[in-house]
Structure formats: C-alpha cells, structure tokens
From Swiss-Prot:
Source species of the chain: Trieres chinensis
Membrane-protein topology: Single-pass membrane protein
Subcellular localization, as worded in the UniProt entry: Plastid, Chloroplast thylakoid membrane
Family matches, as Pfam families: PsbT
Record keywords, A-Z: Chloroplast, Membrane, Photosynthesis, Photosystem II, Plastid, Thylakoid, Transmembrane, Transmembrane helix
Name of protein: Photosystem II reaction center protein T
C-alpha cells in the first residue's frame, strides 16, 4: 500500500511542476 501512496505523491508533484513550467514558458497558448 505504501508503494501506491508514494507513487501517487510522486506523480502529483511531477504534474504540478510540469504545469507550472508549461504555463510559464508558453503564455501564447493561454492568450489563444
């Protein structure tokens, strides 16, 4: 069960960082 929790937290952190960098580096898509 611990493996699933750690995996979930890891994926969640990676997704947050990915979206943060994505929205910072590509504001053109938001201004579509």
């Amino acid at each position: 069960m611990e493996a699933l929790v750690y995996t979930f937290l890891l994926i969640g952190t990676l997704m947050v960082i990915f979206f943060a960098v994505f929205f910072r580096e590509t504001p053109r898509i938001l201004r579509k």
